């Protein structure tokens, strides 16, 4: 599923640039993706759109729960794991995602069906949440999303 999501991100600038579902399925099949992978990815994206619409309608000013500390329930920490929770907190503290986007990322990570979800896959989820909203990640988030730990320059701690 994640390979299909990355392919869609790399191929289509915005979600509305994607062809209709039938044509998209044919194109994804033609480039070598399995039907099960395609179905799972497109279902995941449909649920992403539904979650985004629900939260946007419920919190139109995107200020809900923005001043509190997010407490994760055990089901969330089991699925996300400590590195993913830390990464989400980093993104929010750096104002690279807002509280509504954070909740969408968490919901979509829980729906991915992996326990714990890898940091690499969480980064794809963050990217897809931003992509689905037509948001272009700034340079800092782009580096964080695409640099592997092996590729990153060592960080100097003071």
UniProtKB/Swiss-Prot annotation:
It comes from the Bacteria. Disulfide bonds: none annotated. It holds the Pfam family DUF494. InterPro entries: Smg (IPR007456). Belongs to the Smg family. HAMAP family: Smg (MF_00598). This is Protein Smg homolog. The lineage of its organism: Bacteria, Pseudomonadati, Pseudomonadota, Betaproteobacteria, Burkholderiales.
């Amino acid at each position: 599923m994640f390979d299909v999501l990355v392919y869609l991100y790399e191929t289509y600038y915005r979600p509305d640039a994607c062809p209709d579902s039938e044509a998209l399925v044919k194109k994804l099949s033609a480039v070598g993706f399995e039907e099960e992978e395609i179905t799972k990815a497109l279902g995941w994206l449909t649920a992403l759109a539904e979650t985004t619409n629900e939260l946007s309608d419920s919190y139109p000013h995107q200020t809900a729960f923005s001043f509190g500390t997010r407490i994760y329930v055990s089901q969330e920490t089991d699925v996300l794991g400590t590195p993913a929770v830390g990464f989400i907190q980093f993104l929010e503290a750096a104002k690279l995602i807002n509280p509504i986007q954070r909740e969408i990322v968490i919901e979509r990570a829980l729906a991915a069906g992996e326990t714990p979800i890898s940091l690499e896959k969480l980064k794809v989820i963050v990217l897809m949440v931003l992509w689905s909203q037509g948001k272009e990640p700034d340079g800092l988030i782009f580096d964080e999303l695409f640099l592997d730990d092996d590729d990153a320059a060592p960080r100097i701690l003071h």
